[in-house]
Amino acid sequence: MRKTLGDMPTDASSSPAELKAVATAGAAVPVSILMPIKNEEGNLPRALGSVAWADEIFVVDSGSTDGSGEVAKAFDAQVVQFKMQGTWPKKKNWALQNLRFKHEWVFIMDADEVLPPEAEEEFRQIVSGEPNDVVGYLINRRFMFMGVWLKHAYYPNWNLRLFKHRLGRYEKLTDSATGSGDNEVHEHVIVEGETGRLKCEMDHFAFPSIEVFVEKHNRYSNWEACVAMDRFTAGNIGVSKWMDRLAVACKDPLSLRVKMGIRRQLKHWSVALPCRPFLRFLYVDLWQRGFLDGEPGFYFARLHGFYEFLCVAKTKELKRRFKAAAKNDEDA
């Protein structure tokens, strides 16, 4: 029987033995955890410790070179190796399609995320309760930055993570944009059915340092530039056609798919706005009230403005290369 956690230490450096030492015996929750990783030895004890009550845990590894596999096995997790073949499917969709889950419900979390102790009972009630029309649940994430929870910037941040695995898949955005690597980073889960919201909230330690923030967003800006170039080389779609697509999507204004679609269309339109970096800073600092988070909120907003600057600069660089290559072909 899997051990449940209780009051666990929150220090990511705690060993599996230390985390299990504070665990108490209890009935496992009939849910499958899916955690994609690569070189997450430092984060895994905290993340896996927070879901030690789950009956089944899959860790899908993209060839870690640290001790991630050993740490995962110490928590009785099943470690599955994944190697991306071309562009699709990426890691999470591959896992949803190929892993033999013991349970109907699956919860997807990253190694830098942590569930609170009260999540155990809420998950138990959902997966063991009376059947209803809800097939997926969104969870709110609390971003940690510079050692504090950002209570305004990037909050609330709802993400669909708990769902019936046969009825949910990550969306496929574009074939050509693979800058985000082998894992679904910008994609969202689309489920066939109604959704609800969890009461518990999940802590997200995505940026343990500014260095990590810069490294991640340097990669993400590569992805954004590739997506922008994909649209650029395909020709100008035009605002009228975007409006037509939006009108079709809005036939079901309450669906999660539509809400994400509208947000994504607005993001597409915002690409053409002047002063994007400054506008992104204002969005996080003023609209999302990041200024109420004090100095960490200010730096968080400034860094997101810098991220937009990288997206703009890299896109312009790729366009220059594309035009230069086209000119050389014409002259040849």
Residue ranges and their predicted role:
Residues 53, 74-76, 158, 191:
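Short, structured coil segments at secondary-structure junctions
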Residues 16, 35-56:
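Short, well-formed alpha-helical segments that are part of the catalytic scaffolds
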Residues 45, 66-75, 118:
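Acidic helix N-cap motif at the loop->helix transition within catalytic regions
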Residues 74, 93-105:
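Active-site nucleotide-sugar/metal-binding loop of Leloir-type enzymes
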Residues 81-88:
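Short, acidic/glycine-rich phosphate-metal binding loop used to engage nucleotide
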Residues 6, 89-90, 96, 116-322, ...:
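Catalytic-site signature of metal-activated, phosphate-bearing donor transferases
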Residues 50, 61-71, 84, 110:
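A conserved acidic beta->alpha catalytic loop
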Residues 30-32:
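Cell-envelope/extracellular polymer assembly enzymes that use nucleotide-activated donors
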